[in-house]
Amino acid sequence: GLGVENQKLIYSGWMNGGLHGTAALKVKPVSALKKGGVSVSELQEDMAARGIDTFMTVDMQYVYQDKMLDGYSTMQYGPGYFDHTDIKVDSYFQADGSRDKKLADLISPHYADKVAGALKKAVNKYDLSGLNLGTASWFLYSDYLEQHYTDRQKALTLYGESFSALEESTGKLMGDNGNLYSLPYVDYMINAPMSSNGYQILDQDVPFYAMVLHGYIPYSGEAINMADDYKTTFLKCVESGAGLYYKWIYGDNSLLKETDFDALYSVHYGNWLDTAAQDYKKVAEALRGLENQLIIRHEVLEEDVTKTVYEDGSAVYVNYGKEPAEQDGITIGARDFAVRKGSD
């Protein structure tokens, strides 16, 4: 084995036609799983035997494909504006922010309980041990149509009730960049924000989200193999007390070229396994014993050096600079971190 403990597996694209599938008003595993010889239930049994928690990604909101007999129609389930035009999700060009094309239709938050009902059936049918809530843990939108009018405050309540029902059903939920309304229900969070929104008015980043969550809900930041700068993102995780999150596929990266998923350009697991195991061990060893503690203070000591202090007095120093730094009698290597445990 690689010596990696406390793993969590997120399995995306397993239902309703894949990553960009049909509405979750009905749930059906993709047929390729059967051809591969491993059912959803068998996968989870295998992971459980290895002590790995599995979270199956579900989409309670986006509808990428609208097919005959899939139970969804925009007329019945889609949210709309006061003038009855559909509310949908568009993709935009990065260069100038102009609209590219429709990315997906939506399911009105009015039907959150109906979607949760379909997911609960799937939980029972396929013995799902955990769900990743995806966009529903952060994305709130209204529905202005008279027949199922739902403002954002009502939507928040409806999603909260759905999460509560799903938590009761599976026992384990994961959030994705989750807002406050999802926190009472989730056991783990991915894509937790590690830095500011980058507005020019801001001088420094403070890991506020991490400071609120640490010691209550374990979390990780973005998938670090997808980051522009792996090393900086890795150090951000250390500064913020976050777990390491990787997004992988079994096949070669070239499989995704010229598809809707070509943004996933660095995801073949074989290229990352050794690096991930090595970095995990380094962080796990250094931060052992701090997982359940609160972060009580965060300081920017100099331009490239931060200090995160935990409730037992332990301090984690991160140096983003290209030269070694000295702080509190501790030398922090270039582009590295150092830990002073509270008992030292």
Place the predicted regions along the sequence by residue.
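Active-site-proximal substrate-binding groove within the catalytic cores of carbohydrate-active enzymes
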Residues: M60-L128, S137-D344
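Aromatic- and glycine-enriched glycan-recognition loops and surfaces
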Residues: G1-K67, K154-E161
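Structural preference for beta-strand elements that scaffold enzyme active sites
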Residues: N6-K8, D53-F55, S129-N132, K172-M174
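A mature extracytoplasmic/lumenal domain signature
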Residues: Y11-M15, T135-S137, G321
